[in-house]
Amino acid sequence: IETENGVVRFYSLHLTHLTSETRMPQVKELLRIHREAGMEGPPVCGDIEMSGYWSEGMAKTSAPGAAVLLGDFNFQPDSNEYTEMIGPLTPCDGRVTHPLGFVDAWVHAGGDEGGGKTASVGSTPARLDYAFVSASLCDQIRSCWIDVDADGSDHQPLWLELN
């Protein structure tokens, strides 16, 4: 999506709820797709050798490096999957984020890493829904909040506002 800050890839997703062992390969694949997007190019469909009909004569664009991942990740902030997404926690300096990695928009906007309940695991409130933003976009996070009044799902919507 073209924004005032450049083109950004947005992903809406839902990872498996089964086990950490079934989610971790999904997390690793998301990170691989993100890191290799520039080399793989933009998504296209159909026969790209056609006369240019699909592109309406526009030149092929490159894949942007910036991305936002939104959705039900089915893991909690104390999980291995969360650490894989945003980096390890150090006792002195907080999370060590890879320059090509992601930040948790909820935390970057001032939310508590262990807080912000979006769903329940059994009868225990949990944060399973996230907005992960490319490290290169973290300064663009204006706000991130949970719509606690919404009742259209068993999860509460997580909203993200970027500059």
Predicted regions and their residues:
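Active-site regions of metal-assisted phosphoester/phosphodiester hydrolases
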Residues: 1-163
